[in-house]
């Protein structure tokens, strides 16, 4: 049986290609402002440190879905911070990291060589990596017209964008949702930076003004490390 050599199909991560220029920038007298990886650099809030310390004597593995209290807390935060309503406890799933979720999502959806995954032109590289790991086809597009007559199985969107900061307006989001639903495609909205905005007010794909109160086929991805 022929085996697919996955490593040969994966792109070179941009951080690897930036190593030389990063070293040069660090040697500069003014130092470097490194925006290449979204690693938290601020001090951990005392409240979080205290909560972790208090839970340090509770060994054991949690359930995959997390505790009911955790899911209720997430639902409350989504409504309080972003105006997202209508999310039930069964619609919330804590994961070990959003990067891992994004990388595995095409595989978890059962996608393969006959399936199409749409990713933004300038975007987090793991969208592309996840599609390739599943053996799916990748289309790089920032507009629906670029996809053409083809029918995707999964569409990644990212607002506010990493790395450009671009925010997709409500009309644009509604159009993408309608377009995807007409084709039976799942939308995975990477909303890790939803709470970080300046001039524009970003909206979740789950917001009533975007989804119409129907979350069918919509997946919003949030990141604890970007909001804590």
Give the location of each predicted region:
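Residue-level marker for buried hydrophobic side chains located in beta-strands
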Residues: 187-188
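Walker B catalytic acidic pair
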Residues: 191
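Conserved core of the PLP fold type I
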Residues: 58-179, 195-215, 219-223
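N-terminal small-domain helix-loop-helix segment of the aminotransferase-like
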Residues: 2, 6-97, 104
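Helix C-cap/helix->beta junction micro-motif
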Residues: 25-28, 134, 182-183
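Secondary-structure boundary/capping motif
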Residues: 10, 44, 164-168, 197, ...
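Active-site beta-alpha turn of Rossmann-fold NAD(P)-dependent dehydrogenases/reductases
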Residues: 36, 222-225
């Amino acid at each position: 049986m022929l085996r697919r050599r996955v490593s040969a199909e994966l792109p070179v991560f941009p951080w690897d290609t930036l190593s030389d220029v990063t070293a040069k920038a660090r040697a500069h007298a003014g130092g470097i402002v490194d925006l290449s990886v979204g690693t938290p650099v601020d001090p951990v809030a005392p409240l979080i440190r205290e909560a972790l310390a208090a839970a340090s004597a509770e060994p054991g593995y949690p359930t995959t879905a997390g505790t009911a209290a955790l899911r209720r807390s997430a639902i409350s935060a989504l409504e309080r911070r972003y105006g997202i309503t209508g999310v039930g406890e069964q619609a919330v799933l804590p994961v070990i990291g959003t990067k891992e979720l994004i990388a595995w999502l095409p595989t978890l959806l059962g996608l393969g060589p006959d399936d199409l995954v749409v990713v933004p032109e300038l975007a987090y590289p793991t969208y592309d990596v996840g599609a390739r790991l599943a053996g799916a086809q990748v289309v790089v597009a920032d507009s629906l017209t670029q996809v053409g007559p083809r029918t995707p199985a999964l569409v990644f969107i990212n607002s506010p964008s990493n790395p450009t900061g671009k925010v997709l307006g409500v009309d644009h989001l509604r159009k993408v949702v309608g377009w995807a639903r007409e084709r039976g495609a799942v939308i995975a909205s990477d909303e890790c930076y939803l709470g970080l905005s300046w001039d524009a007010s970003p909206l979740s794909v789950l917001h009533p003004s975007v989804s119409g109160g129907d979350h069918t086929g919509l997946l919003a991805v949030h990141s604890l490390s970007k909001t804590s």
